[in-house]
């Protein structure tokens, strides 16, 4: 059906704007943020702080996930407060380490917390197609922020890191909108007898994008940085705009999907749990 092919295109566009970007994200941060060298013999330059950050990441992920399943309000919000405190602590440690790797590692933490919320919302309230549109809008906003806003903070250590953290967290949230809303939509678009083949076809199409766009990012990066030999001085504006264009294409297809859903009564905006 046309709905299935639209969902497949949305999948490849959204994932191609995120997964290939992850391969270049650390270097992009190195090019757009100002870091100072941390003494190797200090606490922030030691290997111990890396292990502590790993533990904090697991703590944040666990508490954010558990928050969704707590019944008592007091306990629920206490767990949420612990998760937020852990996230802030992790971000502070990433800043003190002056490490682009530590900063980008925050990417999945918000997604861990909100994906169950989004999945539960789709089950009980629906609006899967609208979530895909929202995810595309967030995707566009994040890549344009990386392209045009973040470079303006170069030289401002605190401001640049704050913008980077917020944008990375929102990008993670946009990423979580895709699996929470897209994958549950597939059974509504194909016959149950071929659901396995449908998922396989989507993954096949998706992998074409995951193969192609890392190459394109590298080609565009080389073409727009001729003569630049310092890897921390590259200009990422053009590749980021290209990724934002994927978000624009996904947004357009998302609106088309909503129109097709309304005309053909595909049920994408309806809850999965029908009373």
Name each region found by the language model.
Residues 12, 105-109, 137, 200-208:
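Transmembrane alpha-helical cores of Major Facilitator Superfamily
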Residues 27, 183-189:
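Intracellular helix-loop hinge segments at the cytoplasmic ends of transmembrane helices
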Residues 63-71, 114-127, 221:
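Helix-to-loop junctions at the C-terminal end of transmembrane segments
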Residues 192-226:
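A late C-terminal transmembrane helix in Major Facilitator Superfamily
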Residues 219-247:
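A membrane-interface helix-boundary motif in multi-pass transporters
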